[in-house]
UniProtKB/Swiss-Prot annotation:
Name the UniProt record assigns to this protein: AP-2 complex subunit sigma
Assembly, per entry: Adaptor protein complex 2 (AP-2) is a heterotetramer composed of two large adaptins (alpha-type and beta-type subunits), a medium adaptin (mu-type subunit AP50) and a small adaptin (sigma-type subunit AP17).
Membrane-crossing segments per the record: none
Membrane association type: Peripheral membrane protein
Organism whose genome encodes this protein: Zea mays (Maize)
């Protein structure tokens, strides 16, 4: 199960956060800080999977943005790595070559048009086709 999805820039600003488990606001900020600290300084030669508390974080960097997904320790890492890539492809299609500014100024479209909820529902991957 997906615990949360974060899109952060290199400076640690969270551009998009979607939590599938209830957390207090203070805990959310702490999680965002810890995840950023884990992924930003990691050597590119290492894998894109890292243990985080009792879960694991799968991340991928696209330009200046880090797309991170926290999942259960037993979940398939490669499936969620492809999930990140699918999300980026959908954003590229929706925004015509997405960049960080698209997410800053059009974040309501990502939520209002339910781009993320079209293929992830209640923390589970539902749809893997970008055509549907």
């Amino acid at each position: 199960m997906i615990r949360f999805i974060l899109l952060q820039n290199r400076q640690g600003k969270t551009r998009l956060a979607k939590y599938y488990v209830p957390l207090e606001d203070s805990e959310k900020h702490k999680v965002e800080y810890e995840v950023h600290r884990l992924v930003v300084n990691r050597d590119p030669k290492f894998t894109n999977f890292v243990e985080f508390r009792t879960h694991k974080v799968i991340y991928r960097r696209y330009a200046g943005l880090f797309f991170s997904i926290c999942v259960d320790i037993t979940d398939n890492e490669l499936a969620y790595l492809e999930c990140i890539h699918l999300f980026v492809e959908i954003l590229d299609h929706f925004f015509s070559n997405v960049c960080e500014l698209d997410l800053v100024f059009n974040f309501h479209k990502v939520y209002r048009y339910l781009i993320l909820d079209e293929f992830i529902l209640a923390g589970e991957l539902q749809e893997t086709s970008k055509r549907q």
